[in-house]
């Protein structure tokens, strides 16, 4: 094996990234080295690429980007006895301490000392990558790599959709970006009906329909609240799933959900959002869930089972596939323009 490899690196504290040759790492204690078979772009990667306020406060260049991955284990470090060379894995990207109050109460997804690879350490946008053995998830050998790399973001969607009953429930989804599209797929696979999607991008509305949305609405051209009320005979939806992080969409969703309904929030908002909490939440007795990370490891079992069931319509969501990283800038700019679903890299061109 060569000693060097290409990797997408955040080389400096500024917009963009670079494709550079870096050393192939060696696994340390408790780590495994994987040959990256597929890796996909997340919204977090886009924030790092754009060098927004959050990225500036968290990222310390130079650093290899990326955290969604599927790969084959080719070397194990000292002390690793749960993962073997040849295993086909994906990875939970939240490295938890196991010692804090949250972890000791089995709430690992909100560990108070969470570290994330591709954020707090080198990531997986490379031909080879290090994964902590405790974070490795063994995949079925017949799962396509482009599906296996999506399990981490699918976990976000699963926790959002399945935070409460969904089968047979009328559902509004705001935002049909990559995570919203995964949310549509999970909602449909779980029996939600009708699934109504509010999304301003025509490209993404068309993707939403391909994934299985029963109704789509452009909130810039129609009132989505009236749209929902017309469909539900004035009752409102039983479930509101927020993926956009847009304050206006959030408010419209609260208006559209029926009293006593359920709200799950995954989209990240500006720090301050103003809305009528008394009339839109308290007096409506809404059940509100904030969603972050994935429950370890319950969510992963659910995600893997959903994929293996064949009920998840993932193919329309994967809109762009690249062999190698040569066109990574094109991929990021397309994502910035809202002209993609999920983007998947296959690092090894052969």
From Swiss-Prot:
This is L-threonine 3-dehydrogenase. Binds 2 Zn(2+) ions per subunit. It is found in: Cytoplasm. One of its GO terms (molecular function) is adenyl nucleotide binding. Catalyzes the NAD(+)-dependent oxidation of L-threonine to 2-amino-3-ketobutyrate. Gene3D superfamilies: Medium-chain alcohol dehydrogenases, catalytic domain, NAD(P)-binding Rossmann-like Domain. Pathway: Amino-acid degradation; L-threonine degradation via oxydo-reductase pathway; glycine from L-threonine: step 1/2. Pfam families: ADH_N, ADH_zinc_N. Homotetramer. GO terms for cellular component: cytoplasm. HAMAP family: Thr_dehydrog (MF_00627). Disulfide bonds: none annotated. NAD(+) binds at residues 179, 199, 204, 266-268, 291-292. Zn(2+) 2 binds at residues 97, 100, 103, 111. The gene is tdh. Belongs to the zinc-containing alcohol dehydrogenase family. It comes from Thermococcus onnurineus (strain NA1). Its main location: cytoplasm. Keywords: Cytoplasm, Metal-binding, NAD, Oxidoreductase, Zinc. The active site is at residues 44, 47. It is an enzyme of class 1 (oxidoreductase).
């Amino acid at each position: 094996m060569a000693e060097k490899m290409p990797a997408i690196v955040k080389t400096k504290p500024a917009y963009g990234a670079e494709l550079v040759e870096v050393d192939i790492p060696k696994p340390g204690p408790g780590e495994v080295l994987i040959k990256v078979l597929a890796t996909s772009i997340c919204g977090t990667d886009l924030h790092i690429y754009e060098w927004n306020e959050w990225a500036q406060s968290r990222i310390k260049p130079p650093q290899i980007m990326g955290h969604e991955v599927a790969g084959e284990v080719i070397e194990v470090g000292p002390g690793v006895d749960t993962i073997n060379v040849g295993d086909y894995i994906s990875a939970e990207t939240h490295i938890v301490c196991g010692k804090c109050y949250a972890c000791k109460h089995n709430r690992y997804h909100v560990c108070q000392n969470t570290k994330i690879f591709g954020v707090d350490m080198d990531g997986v946008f490379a031909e080879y990558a290090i994964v902590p053995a405790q974070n490795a998830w063994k995949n079925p050998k017949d799962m396509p790599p482009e599906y296996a790399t999506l399990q981490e973001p699918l976990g976000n969607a699963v926790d959002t959709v399945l935070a409460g009953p969904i089968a047979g429930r009328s559902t509004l989804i705001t935002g049909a970006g990559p995570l919203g599209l995964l949310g549509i797929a999970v909602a449909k696979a779980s029996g939600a009906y009708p699934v109504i999607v509010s999304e301003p991008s025509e490209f993404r509305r068309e993707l939403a329909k391909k994934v299985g949305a029963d109704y789509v609405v452009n909130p810039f051209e129609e009132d989505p609240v009236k749209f929902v009320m017309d469909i539900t005979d004035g009752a409102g939806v039983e479930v509101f799933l927020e993926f956009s992080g847009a304050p206006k969409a959030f408010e419209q969703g609260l208006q559209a959900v029926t009293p006593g309904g359920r709200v799950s929030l995954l989209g990240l908002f500006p720090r301050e959002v103003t809305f009528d909490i008394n009339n839109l939440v308290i007096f409506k007795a809404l059940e509100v869930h904030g969603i972050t990370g994935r429950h370890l490891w319950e969510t992963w079992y659910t995600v893997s089972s959903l994929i293996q069931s064949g009920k998840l319509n993932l193919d329309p969501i994967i809109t762009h596939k690249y062999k190698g990283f040569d066109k990574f800038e094109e991929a990021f700019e397309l994502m910035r323009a809202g002209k993609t679903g999920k983007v998947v890299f296959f690092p090894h061109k052969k």
